From Swiss-Prot:
It comes from Thermotoga petrophila (strain ATCC BAA-488 / DSM 13995 / JCM 10881 / RKU-1). This is Adenylate kinase. AMP binds at T33, R38, E60, L61, V62, G88, Y89, P90, R91, Q95, R163, R174. GO terms for molecular function: adenylate kinase activity; ATP binding; zinc ion binding. ATP binds at G12, A13, G14, K15, G16, T17, R130, I139, Y140, I202. The keyword Nucleotide-binding applies. Belongs to the adenylate kinase family. One of its GO terms (cellular component) is cytoplasm.
Length: 220
């Protein structure tokens, strides 16, 4: 089994959830660029991490060449030889082109770019219902993953909070930005003939089954 996948979709589409489930089924690693960046800036002796941390602390966007270098480093690790599921990258056409070149140099190519389509109102409903425990960081959803007691963490019994990012006005803004920024990447993969669209509202099991069909596997 080999597959080189990119997951695209708005915030709240469930990309990370689907990628983790597919990793469990296939053994192909879920590579979250958000996780990579959080890890790299914590490393005191990593020059690349120091550069990125300085840029982020200034509130600036990390340039493509540094993002590409971080991703290249991770994809060059042994566990990615049979494939990967990229979540959070590429965000620009330049990054998509870099990924193509990186794979081409290894005589590989992207299997598919999977676009999880979720309407704005569903994203708003999902994300505004998200709550987090301020003590342990556990994430809940008042609709799909509620705590046992009303708005209290199951573990800490502390009142759950809503992140600023998950307030309706912010969620709608993030969705708009996603459409503007990601459309060129969607168009890029569409022109290459490897864009696969999946309805992100049909439930986790059905979504996973659709992705397994796309890569030519069946969930047995």
């Amino acid at each position: 089994m080999m597959a080189y996948l990119v997951f695209l979709g708005p915030p709240g589409a469930g990309k990370g959830t689907y990628a983790k489930r597919l990793q469990e089924i296939t053994g192909i690693p879920h590579i979250s660029t958000g996780d990579i960046f959080r890890d790299i800036v914590k490393k005191e002796n990593d020059e690349l991490g120091k550069k990125i941390k300085e840029i982020m602390e200034r509130g600036e966007l990390v340039p493509d060449e540094l993002v590409n270098e971080v991703v290249k480093r991770r994809l060059s690790e042994k566990d990615c030889e049979r494939g990967f599921i990229l979540d959070g990258y590429p965000r620009t056409v330049a990054q998509a082109e870099f990924l193509d070149d990186f794979l081409k140099n290894q005589n590989k190519e992207l299997t598919a770019a999977v676009l999880f389509e979720v309407p704005e109102e569903v994203v708003v409903q999902r994300l505004t219902a998200r709550r987090i425990c301020p003590k342990c960081g556990r994430i809940y959803n008042l609709i799909s993953l509620p705590p046992k007691e009303d708005e209290l963490c199951d573990d800490c019994k502390v009142k759950l909070v809503q992140r600023e990012d998950d307030k309706e006005e912010t969620v709608r803004h993030r969705y708009k930005v996603y459409l503007e920024k990601t459309q060129p990447v969607i168009d890029y993969y569409d022109k290459k003939g490897i864009l696969k669209r999946v309805d992100g509202t049909i439930g986790i099991d059905n979504v996973i089954a659709e992705v397994l069909k796309i890569v030519g596997w069946s969930d047995k």
